[in-house]
Amino acid sequence: MREASVALMREPEILTANLELLLQSSEEVLASIEAMSPADRAEVSPEWVARMKASTAPDAWTHGFAVVHRASGARIGSCGYKGPPGPEGIVEIAYGIDPAYQGRGYATEAARALIAFALDSGQVRVVCAHTRPEKNASTRVLTKCGFEWMGERVDPEDGLVWRWELPSNEEK
């Protein structure tokens, strides 16, 4: 296993020291989008929502995970991938922790679990992430996870972003 000390229970439930990452169904994901504020919902990619509606069975690359705090059982966020690995072996991660639980290392712990799952899959050479083009909590999470800043990019969905990459050990 990688640095995150991830234990994979039933496929794919991921346990870390403080968190349980539970695979979500498309219905759960779509319900969580509906529960968002209109401003947050406007940031969700229509293409991604269409993929979610068309999916027939949950899978880790498409549906993502509910982040559950193991000690309390509370759902404290979500995390996942922006799709399956591409032909080049690149996958993008995304994560969000509810404000009441931020600042406690849970985003870093969830990100490390996603990284370990991706790199251990044998399908991924590089894990990437995009952030707003400024130093913020997400850039600190990625730095702690060993990502390297690759520069600015224009993302078709998000506009100007900073791109971060973490190659597998074989790629370094």
Predicted regions and their residues:
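Conserved beta-strand-loop-alpha-helix junction that forms the acyl-donor binding cleft
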Residues: 129-139
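Conserved active-site tyrosine of GNAT-family acetyltransferases
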Residues: 142
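GNAT-family acyltransferases
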Residues: 1-92, 96-100, 113-121, 126, ...
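Glycine-rich acyl-CoA binding loop
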Residues: 105-108
